[in-house]
């Protein structure tokens, strides 16, 4: 499995060329993309500027010598490569297993070409078997938890050891065990309109390419362009 993740990450790095501003994703597959960019910067003299999606990725990129800028200092990003926890046939996805969903979505938004790198196990018929992360402000989080519970979403607070995980943005994450999300777009809108929810892990209609690594090789899936 780790070998497949590496193949997907390295394949995505081939889309990066000199002079690009690139979004550097978070997670076990995006890790290999960042490593390959670091190698190319060092060995090939690749000239890029990175924008990171988490403190973990910032630390990795700095260690590799990749020049970085804040999201606040750029207007657009040429290419962002990130992982995904699930991807359905309509190119909707669940992200946030690494607790970086808010920063990931902020970086994805001004991106001209958004690529996900996954192994074949992440491709699903319907989203929802992977718990949907919902980032919430700390104030009122327990009340919101009860609202989700009453709605039948089977919520659980993301934990780190014995205490609630706190994201880079100082929020909590409530994971929803939904089983199957029949209409990801409608459910995304529902969460968008829920007071106290900062962001959720449904990335609907955002991705341009999905690079899928399997034992049979690498497949690049292109999302249909919006008319």
Swiss-Prot record:
EC numbers: 5.3.1.6
Gene name in the database record: rpiA
Record's keyword terms, sorted: Isomerase
Name of the featured protein: Ribose-5-phosphate isomerase A
Top-tier EC class: isomerase
Function according to Swiss-Prot or TrEMBL: Catalyzes the reversible conversion of ribose-5-phosphate to ribulose 5-phosphate.
Active site: 104
GO biological process, one term: pentose-phosphate shunt, non-oxidative branch
Domain of life the protein comes from: Bacteria
Family membership noted in the UniProt record: Belongs to the ribose 5-phosphate isomerase family.
GO terms, molecular function: ribose-5-phosphate isomerase activity
Subunit note: Homodimer.
Known catalytic reactions: aldehydo-D-ribose 5-phosphate = D-ribulose 5-phosphate
Pathway listed: Carbohydrate degradation; pentose phosphate pathway; D-ribose 5-phosphate from D-ribulose 5-phosphate (non-oxidative stage): step 1/1
InterPro entries listed in its UniProt record: NagB/RpiA_transferase-like, Ribose-5P_isomerase, Ribose5P_isomerase_typA_subgr, Ribose5P_isomerase_type_A
Amino acids binding substrate: 26-29, 82-85, 95-98, 122
